[in-house]
Amino acid sequence: MTTGLSASRKTPGVFLAVILGGAGTSSGVAPKRTLLQGNAILSARASTLNLLTSPQIAITAGTMTAAATPTFCASADDAGSYAGRGSELHDMAIGFFAQYPAGTLFIQAVADAAGTAASLVCTFATDASAAYTLRIYACGQVLDVPVASGATPTVIATAAADAINDADTLPYIAQFSAGALTLTAKCTGPRGNMLTCAFSFISSAGLETSITTSSTSSGAGTTGILSGGTAEGGEYFFASGATQDTNADAIAAIATTKFDRIVGSYIDSGNLGRLSAHLDSLAGVLVQKRQQGIVGSNGTLAAVTTLATGQNKPRLQLAWHYNSRVPPWVVAAQVTAARLIGDSVAGGLLVGEETDPAANLCGLELVGVTAQNTIADQPLSTEIESALNNGITPLALSANRPGYTIVVRSVTTRCLAANVPNYAVIDTTVVTSADYVADDLQATLGTTYAGFKLAPNSADGLPPRSERTTTPDLIRAVIARELKLYEEQGILIDVDANLPLLTVEASSVTPGRVDCVIPVEVIPGLIILGGDVRQLS
């Protein structure tokens, strides 16, 4: 029967209805929406920072509200306006858009706990006896501060503070008192202890000398020494950040909203547990808002192993970049963007999950995540293998772009079943592909059978004669057809072999209900290629 044309109509004519988006049409490809959750610099924190006077700080507070409805963000500069420049959210947006300039991004502020901000001190002593350069390595940026002969420690510290504060995307500010340069995180709490800043003296001949926790000579009179932080490997991190924030209110504000990827700045078990519970809840059969979460860490392998195995969730990814000078929340945002769009912006060849849900993501080039400064901090092959075995996504040195990193293999934190190693859902593409199939089938079946009636399977195998009526066997045929299409697209494998497992049955208890079991075997990526090269005589 023609849609909208009553069977009782008497007026002669030809009446054709154009049906858009109905049965038989593709649901189309929707853009993947990414949500960043992290601290913003709002009015209270900005007011505190703006009380500092050596030098005077002038930070403009972000305009967003903590734990509110997420804000659409069209650019990194927009994120700076909404969340405050140099906030976690601003820096995460910079990392995301650097990899995926056209990505669809939302940001949501997790309320700053108004605790203690992490800090670090570099103290200069003795006037400069010759000109040199003070080099500052700050979150992937390199700031060179010229020092003239005769410059006092106060002059040197002042110039360094000005250089750091002028780079307003940095997550910390600088103050000086005589020759003591103090860096303080813009956001409070223990995540500030994951920040690092390195200093070097560059002589007129170009010789570089790193400033350490021992008095370090510039070779031109001035000395420098680091204090107030924590040494780890070849880096010196901020310290004393305290009072953990909570994402509980932020999670509650998106309790019914789907974002394909949620990137958290947090790395503590409490906040991660709430994120994981949210992902599991919304993926349930009555909600069907399937999502994945991504976080980052620059901690030790032992620490991230405890964290990943403690979560053990297929919808959660933990990106690990030990002793990274780029904050881990920025690393997580850029890994997320690379997973979605691939690495062409970094000169790579890999496509992302928006193009192919089963894309092989091994070796994704990250455009802005720099490698560790010291070789000793770069993970060994045994450490990379251990990370993968424990549900951790490790980053490693890029062979194509010296000084930058790649994603070794994109894995989920799900690595255990009943405390026994189990890698059935090791790759994030398994989750992405299964979600793609479920989302697409949901759309296809919903449009195909909208307003249909359900009849029992016919004994002769023929379809029902009445309009808008189907049977379990006909539904099964449609699902089987779609599974074959996914196989042709390179998303699934062995569809024919698995078809005996595809069951579609009318409920014997609830009239009008059909229950299905739909087997999906996701195509694996080519991960390892081994062989022997044998010498012949």
Q: What is each stretch, according to the model?
A:
Residues 1-345, 498-499:
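Polar low-complexity, Ser/Thr/Gly/Ala/Asp/Asn-rich disordered segments used for subunit assembly
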Residues 307-392:
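Loop-centered beta-sheet repeat module
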Residues 1-104, 356-361, 365-537:
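Structured, hydrophobic secondary-structure cores that serve as assembly/anchoring elements
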